[in-house]
Amino acid sequence: GLVGSEMCIRDSIETIAERLRFYKAENIVVDPVMVATSGSDLIASDAVRTLCWELFPLSALITPNRHEAEVLAEMAIHSRDDMVRAAQTIAGRYGCNVLLKGGHSDTDADDLLALRDGQLLWFPGQRVDNPNTHGTGCTLSSAIAANLAKGFGLADSIARAKAYLTDALNAQLDLGQGSGPLDHTLGGTGVENWMHGVPDAVQDK
Protein backbone atom coordinates (compact mmCIF):
# COMPACT_ATOMS: atom_id res chain seq x y z
CA GLY A 1 0.00 0.00 0.00
CA LEU A 2 0.90 3.68 -0.15
CA VAL A 3 3.66 4.50 2.36
CA GLY A 4 4.21 7.92 3.89
CA SER A 5 4.98 11.24 2.26
CA GLU A 6 7.49 11.98 -0.49
CA MET A 7 10.01 13.32 2.05
CA CYS A 8 10.20 10.15 4.11
CA ILE A 9 9.02 7.40 1.80
CA ARG A 10 12.46 5.99 0.96
CA ASP A 11 13.41 5.77 4.64
CA SER A 12 10.03 4.21 5.39
CA ILE A 13 10.48 1.55 2.72
CA GLU A 14 13.99 0.73 3.95
CA THR A 15 12.74 0.45 7.54
CA ILE A 16 9.83 -1.79 6.53
CA ALA A 17 12.17 -4.04 4.54
CA GLU A 18 14.63 -4.26 7.44
CA ARG A 19 11.87 -5.27 9.87
CA LEU A 20 10.49 -7.86 7.44
CA ARG A 21 13.96 -9.40 7.17
CA PHE A 22 14.46 -9.25 10.94
CA TYR A 23 11.22 -11.10 11.67
CA LYS A 24 11.62 -13.42 8.66
CA ALA A 25 8.11 -12.48 7.61
CA GLU A 26 6.32 -14.68 5.09
CA ASN A 27 3.33 -14.25 2.78
CA ILE A 28 4.27 -10.66 1.93
CA VAL A 29 2.09 -9.22 -0.83
CA VAL A 30 3.24 -5.84 -2.16
CA ASP A 31 0.76 -3.57 -3.91
CA PRO A 32 3.20 -1.04 -5.40
CA VAL A 33 0.76 1.93 -5.36
CA MET A 34 3.12 3.84 -7.64
CA VAL A 35 0.76 5.16 -10.28
CA ALA A 36 -2.87 6.23 -9.85
CA THR A 37 -5.66 5.02 -12.11
CA SER A 38 -5.46 8.42 -13.81
CA GLY A 39 -1.82 7.72 -14.69
CA SER A 40 -0.41 10.24 -12.20
CA ASP A 41 2.78 9.31 -10.32
CA LEU A 42 2.23 8.79 -6.59
CA ILE A 43 5.85 8.45 -5.48
CA ALA A 44 9.18 9.88 -6.67
CA SER A 45 11.50 7.91 -8.96
CA ASP A 46 14.18 7.39 -6.28
CA ALA A 47 11.54 5.89 -3.99
CA VAL A 48 10.45 3.59 -6.82
CA ARG A 49 14.01 2.23 -7.05
CA THR A 50 14.07 1.61 -3.30
CA LEU A 51 10.70 -0.11 -3.46
CA CYS A 52 11.86 -2.37 -6.29
CA TRP A 53 15.18 -3.44 -4.82
CA GLU A 54 14.27 -3.52 -1.11
CA LEU A 55 10.69 -4.84 -0.94
CA PHE A 56 10.05 -6.77 -4.15
CA PRO A 57 12.68 -9.48 -3.48
CA LEU A 58 11.15 -10.12 -0.03
CA SER A 59 7.63 -10.60 -1.34
CA ALA A 60 5.60 -13.68 -2.17
CA LEU A 61 3.85 -11.57 -4.81
CA ILE A 62 3.66 -8.05 -6.20
CA THR A 63 0.43 -6.78 -7.76
CA PRO A 64 1.06 -3.90 -10.19
CA ASN A 65 -1.70 -2.43 -12.31
CA ARG A 66 -1.07 -1.75 -15.99
CA HIS A 67 0.32 1.75 -15.43
CA GLU A 68 2.69 0.53 -12.72
CA ALA A 69 3.80 -2.42 -14.84
CA GLU A 70 4.62 -0.05 -17.69
CA VAL A 71 6.94 1.87 -15.36
CA LEU A 72 8.54 -1.25 -13.90
CA ALA A 73 9.04 -3.00 -17.25
CA GLU A 74 9.85 0.23 -19.11
CA MET A 75 7.45 -0.55 -21.94
CA ALA A 76 3.94 0.24 -23.11
CA ILE A 77 1.20 -2.34 -22.57
CA HIS A 78 -1.56 -2.52 -25.17
CA SER A 79 -2.28 -6.24 -25.53
CA ARG A 80 -2.15 -9.63 -23.80
CA ASP A 81 1.21 -10.28 -25.44
CA ASP A 82 2.47 -7.02 -23.96
CA MET A 83 1.21 -8.13 -20.54
CA VAL A 84 3.20 -11.36 -20.86
CA ARG A 85 6.40 -9.56 -21.84
CA ALA A 86 6.01 -6.95 -19.10
CA ALA A 87 5.22 -9.46 -16.35
CA GLN A 88 8.13 -11.70 -17.35
CA THR A 89 10.47 -8.71 -17.48
CA ILE A 90 9.50 -7.58 -13.97
CA ALA A 91 9.70 -11.10 -12.52
CA GLY A 92 13.13 -11.66 -14.05
CA ARG A 93 14.50 -8.25 -13.12
CA TYR A 94 13.47 -8.28 -9.46
CA GLY A 95 13.24 -12.01 -8.73
CA CYS A 96 9.61 -11.93 -7.63
CA ASN A 97 6.25 -13.40 -8.59
CA VAL A 98 4.12 -10.84 -10.44
CA LEU A 99 0.35 -10.57 -10.74
CA LEU A 100 -0.22 -8.04 -13.52
CA LYS A 101 -3.77 -6.80 -13.06
CA GLY A 102 -5.87 -6.37 -16.17
CA GLY A 103 -8.69 -4.37 -14.66
CA HIS A 104 -7.74 -1.29 -16.69
CA SER A 105 -8.64 -3.06 -19.93
CA ASP A 106 -11.76 -1.87 -21.73
CA THR A 107 -12.84 -5.40 -22.64
CA ASP A 108 -12.13 -7.76 -19.74
CA ALA A 109 -10.52 -8.03 -16.31
CA ASP A 110 -8.07 -10.87 -16.93
CA ASP A 111 -5.04 -10.94 -14.62
CA LEU A 112 -1.71 -12.58 -15.44
CA LEU A 113 0.53 -14.35 -12.94
CA ALA A 114 4.19 -14.63 -13.94
CA LEU A 115 6.15 -16.83 -11.55
CA ARG A 116 9.84 -16.59 -10.80
CA ASP A 117 10.40 -19.90 -12.61
CA GLY A 118 8.84 -18.56 -15.83
CA GLN A 119 5.44 -20.25 -15.51
CA LEU A 120 2.43 -18.19 -16.61
CA LEU A 121 -1.16 -18.45 -15.35
CA TRP A 122 -4.14 -16.41 -16.52
CA PHE A 123 -7.02 -15.57 -14.18
CA PRO A 124 -10.05 -14.72 -16.35
CA GLY A 125 -12.37 -11.99 -15.17
CA GLN A 126 -15.36 -10.01 -16.36
CA ARG A 127 -15.65 -6.27 -16.08
CA VAL A 128 -18.29 -5.16 -13.57
CA ASP A 129 -20.32 -2.06 -14.37
CA ASN A 130 -19.81 -0.23 -11.09
CA PRO A 131 -18.40 3.31 -10.77
CA ASN A 132 -17.51 2.73 -7.11
CA THR A 133 -14.11 1.09 -7.44
CA HIS A 134 -12.10 2.91 -4.78
CA GLY A 135 -9.81 0.42 -3.09
CA THR A 136 -10.03 -2.45 -5.56
CA GLY A 137 -6.25 -2.98 -5.68
CA CYS A 138 -5.90 -2.83 -1.90
CA THR A 139 -8.80 -5.25 -1.49
CA LEU A 140 -7.29 -7.75 -3.92
CA SER A 141 -3.79 -7.70 -2.42
CA SER A 142 -5.13 -7.91 1.15
CA ALA A 143 -7.39 -10.84 0.26
CA ILE A 144 -4.48 -12.66 -1.41
CA ALA A 145 -2.32 -12.15 1.69
CA ALA A 146 -5.13 -13.37 3.95
CA ASN A 147 -5.55 -16.53 1.87
CA LEU A 148 -1.81 -17.19 1.89
CA ALA A 149 -1.82 -16.81 5.68
CA LYS A 150 -4.62 -19.39 5.85
CA GLY A 151 -2.42 -21.90 4.05
CA PHE A 152 -3.70 -21.74 0.48
CA GLY A 153 -1.20 -21.89 -2.37
CA LEU A 154 -0.43 -18.80 -4.41
CA ALA A 155 -2.66 -19.60 -7.39
CA ASP A 156 -5.58 -20.63 -5.17
CA SER A 157 -5.12 -17.51 -3.03
CA ILE A 158 -5.31 -15.30 -6.11
CA ALA A 159 -8.35 -17.13 -7.51
CA ARG A 160 -10.22 -16.85 -4.20
CA ALA A 161 -9.28 -13.18 -3.82
CA LYS A 162 -10.34 -12.38 -7.38
CA ALA A 163 -13.70 -14.10 -6.85
CA TYR A 164 -14.20 -12.13 -3.63
CA LEU A 165 -13.33 -8.84 -5.33
CA THR A 166 -15.74 -9.54 -8.19
CA ASP A 167 -18.56 -10.23 -5.75
CA ALA A 168 -17.71 -7.10 -3.75
CA LEU A 169 -18.05 -5.06 -6.95
CA ASN A 170 -21.28 -6.84 -7.90
CA ALA A 171 -22.75 -5.94 -4.49
CA GLN A 172 -23.07 -2.39 -5.92
CA LEU A 173 -22.58 -0.39 -2.73
CA ASP A 174 -23.27 3.30 -3.40
CA LEU A 175 -22.12 5.75 -0.72
CA GLY A 176 -21.61 9.50 -0.99
CA GLN A 177 -20.25 11.09 -4.14
CA GLY A 178 -17.44 10.24 -6.53
CA SER A 179 -15.73 6.87 -6.71
CA GLY A 180 -16.95 5.21 -3.54
CA PRO A 181 -15.73 2.12 -1.66
CA LEU A 182 -16.49 -1.53 -2.23
CA ASP A 183 -18.97 -3.56 -0.20
CA HIS A 184 -16.63 -5.89 1.66
CA THR A 185 -19.62 -7.58 3.32
CA LEU A 186 -20.94 -8.59 -0.12
CA GLY A 187 -24.32 -7.05 0.48
CA GLY A 188 -24.61 -8.73 3.86
CA THR A 189 -24.52 -12.26 2.39
CA GLY A 190 -21.29 -13.18 4.15
CA VAL A 191 -18.05 -14.44 2.68
CA GLU A 192 -19.08 -18.09 2.90
CA ASN A 193 -21.00 -17.64 -0.37
CA TRP A 194 -18.24 -16.16 -2.53
CA MET A 195 -16.44 -19.30 -3.69
CA HIS A 196 -18.66 -20.02 -6.71
CA GLY A 197 -16.67 -20.59 -9.89
CA VAL A 198 -13.27 -20.52 -8.21
CA PRO A 199 -12.15 -24.01 -9.40
CA ASP A 200 -12.40 -22.74 -12.98
CA ALA A 201 -10.69 -19.42 -12.29
CA VAL A 202 -7.16 -20.46 -13.26
CA GLN A 203 -6.00 -21.19 -16.78
CA ASP A 204 -2.57 -22.20 -17.98
CA LYS A 205 -1.01 -20.06 -20.67
Q: Which stretches of residues belong to each language-model region?
A:
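Short, small-residue-biased leader/transition segments that mark boundaries at the very start
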Residues: 2-9
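Charged C-terminal helix
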Residues: 155-205
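Short, charged, surface-exposed loops that flank catalytic or proteolytic processing sites
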Residues: 76-83, 149-159
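Short Gly/Thr/Asp-enriched flexible loops that form oxyanion-binding sites at enzyme active sites
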Residues: 12-25, 110-111
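A short helix->loop->beta-strand "cap" motif at the edges of active sites that frequently abuts
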Residues: 23-28, 94-96
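Short, small-residue alpha-helix embedded
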Residues: 70-71, 130-154
